[in-house]
Amino acid sequence: MKSSVLVIDDNDIDQYLIKRQLTESGFTKQVFNSANGEEAIVFLSDYDNNKAEYKNEFPPGLILLDINMPLMDGFEFLKVFKKLRQERDYCATPVVVFLTSSNNQADVDKAMDFDFVKGYLHKPLDIDQLKKIVSN
């Protein structure tokens, strides 16, 4: 079981379904949601408040990331998150897995260029596939 998961997806229904699947399967108890990459960066950057509120659940151990979102898409998030990982030790922990409806091979290749991206899954979420990726 992962300590916590951050789901970055602009679709409220997808967020709800992913959260439900993660918690009901016993994968995690705590799921954080962000509607886009910008919102997620703000959340991840606020260490003091989040650590005080969520204790051992912050920072999340896993980030599930969509590609197509407003304000800051998944690839823009990765660029900013890469810098955040270098600046803040606690951000070096989370594993990123893309969870998207995109079947574009160029997107897969682009995502896997980041060393902290460990997988690329297609919606809907397959918990067994996610467990395989996270366990490696």
Positions of PLM-derived features:
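Conserved acidic segment of CheY-like receiver
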Residues: 3-13, 18-22
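Active-site beta3 strand of CheY-like receiver
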Residues: 48-64
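His-Asp phosphorelay/catalytic-motif detector in bacterial-type signaling
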Residues: 2, 27-28, 58-62, 89-95
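Short alpha-helical interaction/output segments
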Residues: 18, 40, 74-80
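Receiver (REC) domain active-site loop signature in two-component systems and cognate sites
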Residues: 69
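Alpha4 helix (beta4-alpha4-beta5 surface) of REC/receiver domains from two-component response regulators
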Residues: 20, 76, 87, 91-97, ...
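Helix N-cap/capping motif at the beta->alpha junctions
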Residues: 33-47, 74
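A Lys-centered signature of the CheY-like receiver
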Residues: 122-123
